[in-house]
Amino acid sequence: MIIERLVGNLRDLNPLDFSVDYVDLEWFETRKKIARFKTRQGKDIAIRLKDAPKLGLSQGDILFKEEKEIIAVNILDSEVIHIQAKSVAEVAKICYEIGNRHAALYYGESQFEFKTPFEKPTLALLEKLGVQNRVLSSKLDSKERLTVSMPHSEPNFKVSLASDFKVVMK
């Protein structure tokens, strides 16, 4: 089965009205436009998203829906550094330092809370800066991601030469 577009999200439906099968993804797999996965029930699916969301797949995104059957995305919990800022200045410092490392940064549950995937050097940096943090297991959902840049991404358009294009050698 080849999935080329998203159908919606489970939060917009009553999942009890459907038979839902899930594709379990790690947080870093949510930004893939082309991939192969197996659902929990063993169905092979290939994803080739034409208009992939800029932030990536989110928890509950529906990949397939037919009558009462749905295949949806489940983002697995992973080891995460939960960061709690004390002030706007500390928020700026956190965003600068995490961004400088090109690490993913996500909104947390409260106003000054953020999450980033666990890495020992990042944890050591936060400790050195005196930023309150703790390591927990939680989901890193793409819809909560602060950064949208995607290194080495392919353009979402085709380039073609004009019919009157000429190369002149002198």
Swiss-Prot record:
Query: GO molecular-function annotation terms?
Result: nickel cation binding; unfolded protein binding
What the protein does comes down to:
Involved in urease metallocenter assembly. Binds nickel. Probably functions as a nickel donor during metallocenter assembly.
Annotated keywords: Chaperone, Cytoplasm, Nickel
Question: Which family is it part of?
Answer: Belongs to the UreE family.
Task: Report the record's Gene Ontology biological process terms.
Answer: protein folding; protein-containing complex assembly; urea metabolic process
Name the major location: cytoplasm
Q: Which Gene3D superfamilies match?
A: Urease metallochaperone UreE, N-terminal domain, UreE, C-terminal domain
According to its UniProt record, where is this protein located?
Cytoplasm
Has UniProt tagged this entry with the keyword Chaperone? yes
The UniProt entry's GO CC annotations, sorted and at most eight, read:
cytoplasm
Domain of life per record? Bacteria
Entry keyword Cytoplasm: yes
User: What protein is this chain from?
Assistant: Urease accessory protein UreE
Q: What is the lineage of its organism?
A: Bacteria, Pseudomonadati, Campylobacterota, Epsilonproteobacteria, Campylobacterales
The record lists the organism as Helicobacter pylori (strain G27)
